[in-house]
Amino acid sequence: METALFVFAHPDDVADGMGGMASLLKDKFDLHLVCATKGERGLPGRSPDETAAIREKEEERECGLLGGKLDFLGRIDAELIVDAETCRRAAEIVRRTNPAAVFTLWPVDNHPDHEAVSEIARRAVLMAGSPAEIVYLEAGEDQTELFTPSVYLDISEVMDRKLELVRCHECQNPDDRLAQHSLRKATRRGKEIGCAYAEGYRPLPASDSDTPSIFSALSQTRMPVE
């Protein structure tokens, strides 16, 4: 099978941002997750090493549910920058996996790690000489800026699965807050296209014009309502 590659900043970014997409792709593509950091600063009161160990296990649990492979780039939460070594590591994974599509976060975001990983993913595709389609997705409701979906995915049939992925990240989900955030976001996007739950995306065309979009493999793809 072809590979879908997800390049993101923190554990839980995939589950919250594209858990529906990942659930729909898992039986059609080999999934490969690349996490730049281990979210070391995501638990106030815990040391970075302790937090990293907790969040790594949670990300491995999510990846197991998706039947995917997981790599970490070894960078530090809240210190992610677009440097040559990180881009080189990411590019090597792109070369090795030869993905049909690379999913990453939208580059305009008030979290510096999100902006950095977006550029790292873009440069990795270029450095690898890959024809992969780059697909941008949104992060949290109060983080991503200037994002208007150009294509939607109806995830109504897998919303429960998405929430299961989100709930793998127990340390980020006190009182089910992260799951409820994901539910609100999917409900809002669903209303925009007339379904129960949806995710929004902005794909860039593959450099090879003959390469079909990954969305062509998904019957749940929807276009914006005029």
Language model regions located:
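Metal-dependent de-N-acetylase/amidase catalytic core
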Residues: M1-V7, R46, K69, I76, ...
